[in-house]
Design a protein with these regions (language model features):
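The feature marks the mature, well-folded catalytic cores of soluble enzymes
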Residues: 1-132
Length: 132
């Protein structure tokens, strides 16, 4: 096992770390790198957290796909077969979209392009008190 050490602002690497994807036909693994703003700007600073996916891709010598969309890893769940679950309360929240409500069609388009999912199941909200 290899251990990679990096400074972070917060311990929740599930939310700010890389999301790994695997090509169904080639088996090639890559990293997706989303913007991170510490759960809608609640816990500044987040600059070190936001840098982790890029550092991981470099350390692991993996291809990295970047997105300008703000996303925490804990805000989505996939089954690896094309379906993704998420909540409107998080992914469409104005604190992830520059103060304006997110556009569901645009968010879906980006999730599908970056993660290769086909179906997205939206819930209105998640568990009370869970920021992701």
């Amino acid at each position: 096992m290899d251990i990679y050490e990096n400074n972070t602002n917060d311990v929740w690497c599930r939310d700010h770390g890389p999301i790994f994807i695997k090509h169904n036909e080639t088996g090639k693994v890559a990293i997706t790198d989303w913007e991170f703003n510490a759960w809608g700007g609640k816990f500044p600073p987040w600059d070190l957290d936001n840098a982790i996916p890029e550092k991981a891709a470099a350390a692991l010598k993996m291809e990295r796909f970047t997105s300008k969309m703000i996303l925490e890893g804990g805000a989505i769940e996939t089954n690896g077969k094309g379906t993704l679950l998420t909540t409107e309360a998080v992914l469409l929240n104005p604190n992830r979209h520059g103060g304006k409500p997110g556009n569901k069609a645009e968010v879906e388009k980006e999730l599908k392009a970056m993660l290769g999912v086909k179906d997205i199941v939206w819930f209105k909200k998640g568990i009370e008190g869970d920021d992701t």
